[in-house]
C-alpha cells in the first residue's frame, strides 16, 4: 500500500509488479496515439494481393477466412503455411498447426514456417524448440532483406539472445521503415525490457502505416497500462472491435478488470477468450490466479492442471498467480508460487526476477539479491529494473540498522543519528495505539526503511525511479518511505507517512492480507486524522468544491478509483470519510469485525453483509448525509462564484457584490486581495476575517490566516501577526516557514515561556527534523522541566547535525547527562567541549564538579 502526497500528483495502483513511471512516455508520445486511434476508426482497407488479404483476415480475427484464402495461394510456400498455422494456433488447434508446419520447416529450416514451429514448440514445452529456433536465427548475420532480419530477430528474442535480436530488429526497421509487423515485434521486445518510450514509438510507427494493425494497438495498450489505465483500456477495446477474436486483447482487458476489482468481468473476458482458444495458456493462467486469490484451491489446481496438460513446463501459470497474490498484499504466498514456477522452469529469468521482488517485499533482502543476480546472469540484456534493484540494495547495505523490539529500522548513516530519535518512538507510539484500538498485535519483525533519495525509495518498491506522488509503501511486514530530506521541508508530512504505513501493517495482517484497497487506505488516512487532525486537512477544501461540482465518487466505485490517476487523490480522502462513517454508524467493534471478516476470504459484498448487515447502496444514503453534515457549510461557502470573474471585477463592484454575498468564501477572498492591492489593509483584514470564519481550515499561503499574518507584519503589528500565524499553523501542518516566523516573532516580543515556544519548535522538527535550532531550544526547555533524558535526546540530535558551536553543543549534552546521573558520559562530552574550546567556562565548571564528585 502507498501513502500518496496529496499536495502533488498521485501514484496509480499499488502494489504494482508492473508499475513504472515514465514521464517522457506521457509527455511525448501519448497524444499522437489518439490521432492514430481516430484513423483506426476508418473503414477496412482493400487488400492488394491474396496474401495481403489473408494476412489482413488473420490480423482482424477472421480465421476461417484465412483458411479459405490460403487455398488460393501456393500451399508449399513457407509464408502461406505459417499464416495458416497461426490461424490454427489462434484457435488452439496446436496439433493441426504442428502437422502443417513440420514438413515445411524440415525443408526450409530458416523459413517463416520454421519460426512458427519453433515458437509453438517453445510454448508447448517441447525439447526441440531451441534447435528449431537456432536454425531460424542462424542467418541473422548475413541477412539483408527486412523479412529475413525480422524473422531472425523474433527467433533470437525467443532464445533470450536479446542483444542479437536488437541488432536484427534495428536492421530490419532500417530496411523497411514503418513496416507494421516489424515495428510491432520490435516494440514488443522493447516493452519486455521496460523501454516504454521507445516501445510506444515503435507501436505508433506501425499504426501510422496501418491504423488497424491490432498487435500494435494492443502493444500500445500494454505500454500505457500503468501510467494511464483508462486510455490503455480504450486502446485495447479498439483492438477488440477490429478483431473480436483477439485472445491476447481479451486477456489484457481481463487483467485490467482484475486491477479494478471487477473480477466477474475479468472471468467473463477470460471465458470468451477460451471460446476462441480453449487451450490458451494465458487465459488458464489468469483464471487460475483469480481462483487462487479467491481461495478456491480446488479450482486453482484444476486450472493449473489444464495449463500443464497443454504445456507441462508452463511455469507462468504459477508466476501469474504469484503476481496477482502480490498485488493483493499476499507476498509470502507470492514467494511460494514463484518457487513453484521455478520447479518447472528453473532457469527462467523472468520468474527469478519476480521472486526477487517478492522476497524484497517480505524483507528477505539477501534472498532477493541472490534471485535477481541469478536472473541477470541468465539474461543480462538492458534490464534496468534488475540493475536498479541491485544498486539500491548496495545503497541499503551502507545504511545503519537500528533494532528496537520488533522494529528494525534501516536509515542512511547521514540521517540515522537524528531520525532514530524521532522515528523509533513515533513507530512504537503508532503501533501501540492502533494495536489497542484494533485489538490486534501484528506479527514482526517489522522492517522500516527510510530513504533520503526518493528515487531509491521508488526503486525499492517497483524497480524504477518515479512514483512521484508516493511517499511511503507497506507490504505487510515491510515499510518503505521517503525521509524528510527526500523532499523540500514543508512539502510532505513524514510523520504522517510513517503513521499511515504502520496502519497498513495492522489492517493487512489483521485481514490475513485480504483487505480491499478502499478499506486499508481509508483506515490509514482515517488513523492519520485521529492521531493529529492537522495531518488530514489538505483535502478538505478540495472535497467541498468537488461536492459542488458533483465530482465525488459512488461508494461502489471507490476501489476502482484507486487505479486512475485522475481519481486517486479523491479516492484516498473519500475512503477515509467512509471509514469515519462506518465507525460512527457501527462503532469500532463493527470496523474490527469487518476487517476480520475479510480474513475469511469473502468479497466486499459478502463482508459488508456478514459483518455489518449492510451493503454499499444502504451505506451510500447515510454516507451522503454524513458528508453533508460535515462539509455542508463549507460547500455552500464555495457555491456559485467564479474566481476569474471575481478577480476581474472593479473594486467598487466587488464591494457591492460581496456585501450581497456575505457567505461566499471566494468573494470575501477576492475582496481581501483587491483591498490589499489598493493599500486598504484594515478593510482587507476584515474581508479575510469573514473568509476565515466561513472556511477555518483553509491551508496554503493564499489562505485567510496567512494573508492576515502578512498584513500584520506589514503594519508591524507583532501581536496580531502572532495570533494569525498561530491560527495558520493550527490548520496547515506543512508550513515550516510560518512556524519559524512565529518563533522569531515570539522571541522578538520577549516571549521565552516554554509552554508557548515549545509546541512551535515541536511543529518545526515534526516537519524538518534536521533543524538544529529547534532541537537546541527543545533540549533546554526539557532541562528546565527537569527532564534530562528528553534533553539528551535533543542535544544528541544537535551534535549529529554538525552545529557551528560544537563546544556549546557538547556542553549542553554533558549537562543533560550530568543531571540524569550519567557521569561517565557527561565527562566524555565535557572533555570534547574543552578540546574544542579549552577556556570554555561552562565546560570547565562542569569538569570541576565531575572531578570533585559534587552534585
Show where each model-derived region lies.
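Beta/coil-rich, acidic/histidine-enriched accessory regions frequently appended to metallopeptidases
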Residues: 42-46, 55, 286, 340, ...
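Juxtacatalytic substrate-recognition/specificity segment
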Residues: 56, 201, 234, 241, ...
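Structural signature of tandem alpha-helical TPR/SEL1-like repeats
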Residues: 91-99, 124-132, 159-171, 192-205, ...
Amino acid at each position: 500500500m502507498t501513502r500518496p502526497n496529496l499536495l502533488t500528483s498521485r501514484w496509480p495502483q499499488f502494489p504494482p509488479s508492473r508499475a513504472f513511471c515514465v514521464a517522457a512516455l506521457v509527455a511525448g508520445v501519448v497524444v499522437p496515439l489518439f490521432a492514430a486511434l481516430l484513423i483506426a476508426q476508418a473503414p477496412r482497407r482493400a487488400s492488394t494481393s491474396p496474401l495481403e488479404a489473408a494476412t489482413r483476415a488473420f490480423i482482424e480475427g477472421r480465421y476461417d477466412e484465412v483458411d479459405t484464402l490460403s487455398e488460393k495461394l501456393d500451399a508449399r510456400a513457407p509464408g502461406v503455411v505459417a499464416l495458416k498455422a497461426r490461424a490454427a494456433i489462434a484457435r488452439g488447434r496446436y496439433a493441426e498447426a504442428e502437422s502443417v508446419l513440420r514438413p515445411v520447416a524440415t525443408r526450409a529450416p530458416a523459413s517463416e514456417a520454421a519460426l512458427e514451429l519453433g515458437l509453438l514448440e517453445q510454448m508447448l514445452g517441447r525439447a526441440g524448440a531451441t534447435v528449431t529456433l537456432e536454425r531460424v536465427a542462424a542467418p541473422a548475420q548475413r541477412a539483408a532483406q527486412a523479412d529475413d532480419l525480422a524473422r531472425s530477430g523474433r527467433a533470437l528474442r525467443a532464445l533470450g539472445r536479446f542483444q542479437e535480436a536488437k541488432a536484427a530488429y534495428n536492421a530490419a526497421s532500417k530496411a523497411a521503415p514503418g513496416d507494421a509487423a516489424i515495428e510491432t515485434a520490435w516494440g514488443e521486445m522493447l516493452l519486455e525490457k521496460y523501454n516504454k518510450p521507445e516501445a510506444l514509438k515503435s507501436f505508433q510507427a506501425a499504426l501510422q502505416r496501418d491504423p488497424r494493425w491490432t498487435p500494435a494497438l494492443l502493444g500500445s495498450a500494454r505500454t500505457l497500462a500503468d501510467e494511464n489505465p483508462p486510455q490503455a483500456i480504450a486502446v485495447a477495446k479498439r483492438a477488440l472491435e477490429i478483431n473480436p477474436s483477439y485472445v491476447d486483447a481479451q486477456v489484457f482487458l481481463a487483467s485490467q478488470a482484475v486491477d479494478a476489482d471487477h473480477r466477474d468481468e475479468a472471468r467473463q473476458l477470460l471465458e470468451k477468450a477460451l471460446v476462441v482458444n480453449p487451450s490458451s495458456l494465458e487465459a488458464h493462467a489468469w483464471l487460475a490466479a483469480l481462483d487462487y486469490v479467491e481461495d478456491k484451491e480446488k479450482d486453482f489446481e484444476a486450472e493449473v492442471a489444464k495449463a500443464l496438460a497443454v504445456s507441462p513446463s508452463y511455469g507462468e501459470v504459477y508466476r501469474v498467480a504469484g503476481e496477482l497474490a502480490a498485488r493483493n498484499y499476499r507476498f509470502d504466498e507470492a514467494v511460494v508460487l514463484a518457487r513453484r514456477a521455478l520447479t518447472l522452469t528453473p532457469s527462467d529469468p523472468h520468474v527469478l526476477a519476480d521472486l526477487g521482488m517478492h522476497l524484497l517485499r517480505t524483507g528477505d533482502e539477501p534472498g532477493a539479491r541472490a534471485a535477481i543476480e541469478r536472473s541477470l546472469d541468465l539474461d543480462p540484456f538492458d534490464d534496468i529494473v534488475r540493475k536498479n534493484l541491485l544498486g539500491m540494495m548496495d545503497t541499503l547495505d551502507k545504511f545503519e540498522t537500528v533494532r528496537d523490539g520488533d522494529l528494525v529500522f534501516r536509515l542512511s548513516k547521514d540521517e540515522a543519528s537524528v531520525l532514530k530519535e524521532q522515528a523509533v518512538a513515533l513507530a512504537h507510539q503508532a503501533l501501540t495505539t492502533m494495536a489497542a484500538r484494533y485489538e490486534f498485535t501484528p506479527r514482526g519483525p517489522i522492517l522500516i526503511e527510510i530513504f533520503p533519495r526518493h528515487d531509491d525509495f521508488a526503486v525499492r518498491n517497483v524497480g524504477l525511479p518515479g512514483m512521484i506522488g508516493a511517499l511511503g509503501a507497506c507490504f505487510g511486514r515491510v515499510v518503505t518511505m521517503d525521509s524528510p530530506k527526500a523532499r523540500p521541508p514543508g512539502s510532505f508530512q513524514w510523520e504522517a507517512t510513517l503513521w499511515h504505513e504502520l496502519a497498513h501493517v495492522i489492517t493487512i495482517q489483521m485481514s490475513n492480507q485480504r483487505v480491499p484497497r478502499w478499506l486499508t487506505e481509508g483506515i490509514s488516512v482515517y488513523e492519520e486524522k485521529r492521531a493529529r487532525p492537522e495531518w488530514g486537512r489538505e483535502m478538505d477544501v478540495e472535497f467541498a468544491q468537488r461536492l459542488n461540482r458533483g465530482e465525488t465518487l459512488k461508494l461502489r466505485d471507490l476501489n476502482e478509483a484507486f487505479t486512475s490517476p485522475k481519481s486517486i487523490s479523491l479516492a484516498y480522502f473519500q475512503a477515509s470519510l467512509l471509514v469515519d462513517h462506518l465507525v460512527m454508524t457501527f462503532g469500532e467493534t463493527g470496523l474490527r469485525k469487518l476487517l476480520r471478516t475479510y480474513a475469511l476470504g469473502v468479497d466486499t459484498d459478502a463482508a459488508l453483509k456478514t459483518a455489518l448487515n449492510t451493503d454499499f447502496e444502504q451505506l451510500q444514503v447515510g454516507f451522503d448525509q454524513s458528508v453533508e453534515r460535515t462539509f455542508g457549510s463549507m460547500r455552500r461557502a464555495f457555491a456559485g462564484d467564479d474566481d476569474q470573474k471575481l478577480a476581474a471585477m472593479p473594486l467598487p463592484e466587488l464591494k457591492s457584490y460581496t456585501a450581497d454575498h456575505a457567505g461566499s468564501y471566494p468573494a470575501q477572498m477576492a475582496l481581501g486581495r483587491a483591498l490589499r492591492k489598493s493599500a486598504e489593509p484594515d478593510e482587507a483584514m476584515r474581508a479575510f476575517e469573514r473568509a476565515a470564519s466561513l472556511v477555518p481550515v483553509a491551508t496554503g499561503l493564499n489562505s485567510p490566516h496567512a494573508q492576515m499574518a502578512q498584513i500584520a507584519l506589514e503594519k508591524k503589528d507583532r501581536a496580531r501577526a502572532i495570533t494569525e500565524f498561530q491560527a495558520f499553523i493550527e490548520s496547515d501542518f506543512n508550513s515550516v516557514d510560518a512556524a519559524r516566523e512565529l518563533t522569531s516573532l515570539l522571541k522578538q516580543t520577549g516571549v521565552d515561556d516554554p509552554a508557548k515556544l515549545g509546541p512551535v519548535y515541536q511543529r518545526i522538527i515534526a516537519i524538518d527534523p534536521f533543524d538544529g535550532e529547534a532541537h537546541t531550544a527543545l533540549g533546554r526547555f526539557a532541562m528546565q522541566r527537569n527532564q534530562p533524558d528528553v534533553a539528551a535526546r535533543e542535544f544528541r540530535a544537535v551534535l549529529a547535525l554538525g552545529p557551528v558551536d560544537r563546544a556549546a553543543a557538547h556542553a549542553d549534552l554533558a549537562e543533560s547527562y550530568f543531571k540524569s546521573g550519567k557521569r561517565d558520559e557527561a565527562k566524555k562530552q565535557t572533555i570534547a567541549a574543552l578540546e574544542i574550546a579549552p577556556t570554555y567556562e561552562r565546560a570547565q565548571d562542569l569538569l570541576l564538579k565531575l572531578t570533585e564528585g559534587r552534585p
